[in-house]
Amino acid sequence: MHPHIGVDESGKGDFFGPLVVAACYVGPEHLAELEGVKDSKKLTDPIALKLATNIKRVCPHAVISIGPAKYNELYNSFRNLNKLLAWGHARAIENVLGQQPADLVISDQFANPAELKRRLFEKGKTVELQSMVRAEADIAVAAASILARAEFLTRLKRLGEEFGTTLPKGASDLVIKAGVAFVRKEGQEKLGQVAKLHFKTFLNVMELAKL
C-alpha cells in the first residue's frame, strides 16, 4: 500500500454534541496493528472506543473537536456546512502533516473538493487530494472515522453529564423529546451550548417547548 492520510468526521448529522474531524496517517508498517479497523458506522460504540485507543497509540493522527457553541459561531460565519467541514478537515490534515510527511490524502466524497484545497495551508497545498465514494473502505479513512466517532461519543457523554442529563445521538423523535426537556429545564439560551442550532430539529424543539 502507498502510505497516506485518511480524513473523516462524526457528529455532522447529530443535533446534540460537537462536530469532530479526525485525520490519520497509515503506512505499511501500521497494518499489522490495525486489525479490526473498518468503517466506524459498522462498529458498536464500545468497540469504536477501544479501537480508537489502539489507533492513537500506533498512528500519527489529529482530532479536531468543534463544540456546539463554537460550531454555532462558525456556522453563522460560514453560513454553509460544507465550508465548515472543509475548514475542520484542513486543520486536521495540517496537524498530521506536521507530525508525518505524506503526499496523498483520501477523504469521503466532498461536495466541493476545491473548497478543501483552498482551506489548506502551506504543507497541505503540496499533497494530492482524493475524494472517494464510500471512502471508509480505505484503511486510513476507516481509522480516522473511528477516531472521530470515539471523540464524539466521549464529548457527547461529557456534555450531558455537565447538565445532569443524557443527550441522545442523531436527530430522531427521541432527540426532539430530549431537546424539549432540556429547554424546559435549562432555558433556550443554553441550548446552543449542547446543540447545533441550524438543524430543523431546533425549530421542532422550540415549537414543542412552548406547549
Language model features: what each stretch is:
Residues 1-211:
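RNase H-like, Mg2+-dependent phosphodiesterase core
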